[in-house]
Structure formats: C-alpha cells, structure tokens
Amino acid sequence: MVINFEELHPNERAELERNIFFSTLEQLKGWARSNSLWPMTFGLACCAIEMMGVGSSHYDLDRFGSFFRTSPRQSDVMIVSGTVTKKMAPIVRRLYDQMPEPKWVIAMGSCATAGGPYVNSYAVVKGVDQIVPVDVYIPGCPPNPAALIYGINKLKEKIRYEAKTGKQVTNK
C-alpha cells in the first residue's frame, strides 16, 4: 500500500507520521538482538557471587530481556568473572567457539580484566582478552550487581550502534 502524503488532511498526516516507524532491517535486528541477550555465566571466583545476585529478585536481570543460559549453544553473551588460569584458557576458548554468531564477551572484575591480585602468578592469564575478544570490561574487585547491569546496558548500546552505523567497535 502506497500512501500519498500530499492528499492527506494535515491531522491525518500528523497522525501517520507519529505512529509509523521507518528504519532499516539492520537497525531492527540490532534492536531485537540488544533487547534479548542470553548470557552464559562463566564464574570462576568471587565475582560469580555478585553475578548470581543479578539474577535475584532485588536486581532481576530478566526484566531487561536477559535470561541466563547454561549452554554455550543457547547463549550469545559470555560473562567471564574471576581468575582465568592457563589450564582453564583452552576451555574458555572452546566454549566461546561453541557459541552461535553473533556473540559478545563481558569481562567482569579485575581478575578477568587484567589478572587481578594474582597477575604475577605463573599460572594466571593476564586478562581474558588474550583468549577471546572482549566487548565490555567491568572493573572492580568484585564489581557489584549494579555494575554488571550497567555493563550489560553498555553492551546493548554497542550492539545498537554497530547496527545503526555498520561499524565494528570491537577488537575481533
């Protein structure tokens, strides 16, 4: 159906312009993806306790459209929280590779971001970004649940921005 706006009454035209949304398919997909994130939890230390708090009734991450999944094949966001050891690194990479595209990674806490207090240990990876590409870093030791929700919202903004501009904002 084609609408000729010149033939419409001014009130009808104003009503149509107010109620019709014009966008591209890429922007619509970006909006849908950003509002239905399914994170996979990968809790390795203290930050995992704070991550569990996000799913509790006080913070309730579900109301933002994010539902925790236990399988990498059902999730599109990996939240790595805690110290990643060199022995654990291949497992983190394998889980990342099992996730369907598009996929994103959040590094939660000082240990996942840069090795934390164990950075000088021979067995600790100095940041999960040496194993998988990280999209959002959440600092803190441990960061509180509100910081994780803020990080997830930043990831949503990033997804919508990439869909709108077509530019990648990651180190992939």
UniProtKB/Swiss-Prot annotation:
Membrane topology summary: Peripheral membrane protein
Major location category of this protein: membrane
Keywords on record: 4Fe-4S, Cell membrane, Iron, Iron-sulfur, Membrane, Metal-binding, NAD, Quinone, Translocase, Transport
Cofactor comment text: Binds 1 [4Fe-4S] cluster.
Cofactor (UniProt): [4Fe-4S] cluster
Subcellular location: Cell membrane
Enzymatic reactions: a quinone + NADH + 5 H(+)(in) = a quinol + NAD(+) + 4 H(+)(out)
Known EC number: 7.1.1.-
GO biological process: aerobic respiration; electron transport coupled proton transport
Molecular-function GO term, any one: NADH dehydrogenase (ubiquinone) activity
Pfam families tied to this protein: Oxidored_q6 (PF01058)
Residues annotated for [4Fe-4S] cluster binding in this entry: C46, C47, C111, C141
GO CC entries: plasma membrane; respiratory chain complex I
Listed Gene3D superfamilies: 3.40.50.12280
Class of enzymatic activity (EC top level): translocase
Family: Belongs to the complex I 20 kDa subunit family.
Function: NDH-1 shuttles electrons from NADH, via FMN and iron-sulfur (Fe-S) centers, to quinones in the respiratory chain. The immediate electron acceptor for the enzyme in this species is believed to be a menaquinone. Couples the redox reaction to proton translocation (for every two electrons transferred, four hydrogen ions are translocated across the cytoplasmic membrane), and thus conserves the redox energy in a proton gradient.
Subunit structure: NDH-1 is composed of 14 different subunits. Subunits NuoB, C, D, E, F, and G constitute the peripheral sector of the complex.
NCBIfam families: nuoB_fam, PRK06411.1
Identification of the protein by name: NADH-quinone oxidoreductase subunit B
Organism in which the protein naturally occurs: Bacillus cereus (strain ATCC 14579 / DSM 31 / CCUG 7414 / JCM 2152 / NBRC 15305 / NCIMB 9373 / NCTC 2599 / NRRL B-3711)
Organism ancestry: Bacteria, Bacillati, Bacillota, Bacilli, Bacillales
Gene: nuoB
